[in-house]
Amino acid sequence: MGTLYVVATPIGNLADITLRALDVLRTVDVVACEDTRRTRALLSHFGIHKRLVSCRAHNEAQAARRLIHFLSTPISAFLSPEKGRGRQSARRTRARPGETVGTAALQLAAEATGEQEVCGSPHAQVAYVSDAGTPGVSDPGAVLVRAVRDAGHTVVPIPGASALTTLLSVAGVRDKTVLFEGFLSPHPGRRRARLVQLCAQRVAFVLYESPYRVQKLLEDLVAVAPESQVVLGRELTKVHEELCVGTALRVMESFCARTRVRGECVLLVSAEKF
């Protein structure tokens, strides 16, 4: 059967990509990705040109079905020139450098498989990447992984960058237990209610937030637990990387004084002082 590689990509600094990730991206047949434009730019930076299949949160289940069909296809069934319709299908499923493969191309691969049985031929290999970081960690990927595994294919992790572990490595947190919460609800009432629950557990927790809502999140945190300890990372691994450490009140005052916050934010919140 085929193999799905779940590949972590840099969260900012492209030099953080691993040698193993590059090797996999160079050798797979198709790269499924959250945003084809961003992934095409990433691959082009490293001189890699592959077929791209869109697999975003809103179409992940549909994309998973297409990719499973692809993973079940012997490579030679649609890459080797054959007579008649099989030859036409083989030509049409070849992608030009950087070309995106849509439903029609994958369907042609399935049609070619139905026309002939190739014993002993290796099956397709697919890589999945999110826009940045590790797929499935507050990013699409979980639906695809479950579907591919349930279909009997192999799923292989290719570890690498993650905003979660990047922040933890420089936070200096001593807590043995750290809860990863990810993104809270954008709804103010639900967000504050969840913060009340999290702070009541007296366990360090990690949040992700967009630059557009981080000030509101900090205001809610101050209302719930103003003396809680916060490490806020912004633009991690990028040129304007910033770490802000202090009480929730101090960090909020620092950020609310700005007219505009740029870059994704990661927050570690703890009752214990760092």
From Swiss-Prot:
It catalyses: cytidine(1402) in 16S rRNA + S-adenosyl-L-methionine = 2'-O-methylcytidine(1402) in 16S rRNA + S-adenosyl-L-homocysteine + H(+). It holds the Pfam family TP_methylase. Keywords: Cytoplasm, Methyltransferase, rRNA processing, S-adenosyl-L-methionine, Transferase. SUPFAM superfamilies: Tetrapyrrole methylase (SSF53790). The keyword rRNA processing applies. Gene3D superfamilies: Cobalt-precorrin-4 Transmethylase, Domain 1, Methyltransferase, Cobalt-precorrin-4 Transmethylase, Domain 2. The keyword Disulfide bond does not apply. It comes from the Bacteria. Its EC number is 2.1.1.198. It is an enzyme of class 2 (transferase). One of its GO terms (molecular function) is rRNA (cytosine-2'-O-)-methyltransferase activity. It is found in: Cytoplasm. GO terms for cellular component: cytoplasm. PROSITE patterns: RSMI. Catalyzes the 2'-O-methylation of the ribose of cytidine 1402 (C1402) in 16S rRNA. Belongs to the methyltransferase superfamily. RsmI family. This is Ribosomal RNA small subunit methyltransferase I. It comes from Treponema pallidum (strain Nichols).
